[in-house]
């Protein structure tokens, strides 16, 4: 799950290897480069295992791996090469960049929020919001969160869920790393984050989490409102992904929840 609108951190472009398809997408930033149509994706690499940066500054995770597959699928489906470029930025700036035609897509752990005026793809992952706790915390249930100090990511669906907790003092922070740093310093009683992110941090033994979820969700790709052409192409890619062996492999690799497919 993730966020909604403010400042660009950096504009590092990563071209994921591989060719993919079709004529130029409906967005103003999709273009032909070396006979390949380029789709630019805004991504916030602070949300492992969805997306993060390694020591070389490369963006890694489920979503970048998915984008690499989308390049292949688009080439096969459209019959002309495509490239997907990842443009690094703050999560809460992605929607603004879409609206300004600076990027074509946002792929960064987005879960549905009615107030986000964007085009939504079909879902590609299951998700939920859970409470992460410092190791040794006396909190064992969602009821125990009442009246507690809770950190969330600004603009996220986790923020919305936390504000529903009776008497909770909810503070929005910039990104998941800031949240968990503050939590480990005992500045907050709990944090509400995506389950995939929570499991990533709980695995190192520093944190625990409440077994119950605050809300169950799904992850989506987003585009500028009205840009149905690029979303239609991505929906075909998602359909191909969900039916492939690679899908379960990626979910297992990153410890994420696959969608139930018929």
Predicted features by range, described:
Residues 82-96, 157, 171-185, 217:
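Short helix-initiation/N-cap motifs at beta->coil->alpha
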Residues 15-18:
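C-terminal motif of bacterial Sec signal peptides marking the signal peptidase cleavage site
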Residues 21, 25-27, 35-36, 80-82, ...:
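Ligand-binding clefts/hinges and TM-proximal coupling segments of bilobed small-molecule sensing domains
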Residues 84-144, 206-213:
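Acidic, polar ligand-binding/catalytic clefts
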Residues 44-45, 125-133, 195-239, 257-262:
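Periplasmic-binding protein-like
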Residues 29-108:
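Extracytoplasmic small-molecule ligand-binding "clamshell" domains
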Residues 20, 64-73, 149, 156, ...:
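Extended ligand-binding regions for polar small-molecule ligands
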Residues 59-74, 127-180, 195-199:
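Bilobed "Venus flytrap"/periplasmic-binding protein-like clamshell domains
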């Amino acid at each position: 799950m993730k966020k909604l609108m403010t400042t660009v951190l950096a504009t590092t472009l990563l071209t994921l290897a591989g060719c993919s398809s079709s004529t130029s997408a409906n967005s103003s930033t999709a273009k032909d480069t070396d006979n390949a149509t380029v789709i630019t994706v805004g991504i916030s690499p602070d949300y492992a295992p969805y997306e993060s940066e390694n020591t070389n500054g490369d963006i890694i995770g489920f979503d970048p791996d998915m984008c690499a597959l989308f390049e292949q699928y688009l080439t096969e489906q459209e019959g002309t090469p495509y490239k997907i470029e990842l443009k690094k930025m703050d999560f809460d700036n992605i929607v603004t960049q879409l609206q300004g035609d600076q990027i074509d897509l946002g792929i960064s752990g987005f879960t549905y929020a009615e107030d986000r005026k964007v085009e939504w793809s079909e879902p590609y992952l299951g998700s939920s919001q859970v409470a992460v706790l410092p190791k040794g915390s006396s909190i064992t249930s969602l009821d125990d969160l009442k009246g507690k100090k809770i950190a969330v990511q600004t603009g996220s669906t986790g923020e919305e869920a936390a504000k529903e907790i009776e008497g909770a003092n909810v503070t929005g922070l910039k990104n998941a790393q800031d949240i968990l740093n503050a939590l480990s310093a005992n500045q907050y009683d709990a944090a509400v984050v995506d389950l995939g992110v929570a499991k990533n941090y709980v695995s190192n033994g520093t944190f625990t989490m409440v077994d119950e979820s605050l809300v169950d969700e799904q992850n989506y790709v987003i585009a500028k409102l009205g840009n149905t052409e690029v979303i239609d192409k991505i929906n075909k890619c998602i359909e191909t992904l969900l039916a492939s062996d690679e899908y379960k492999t990626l979910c297992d690799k990153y410890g994420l929840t696959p969608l139930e497919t018929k």
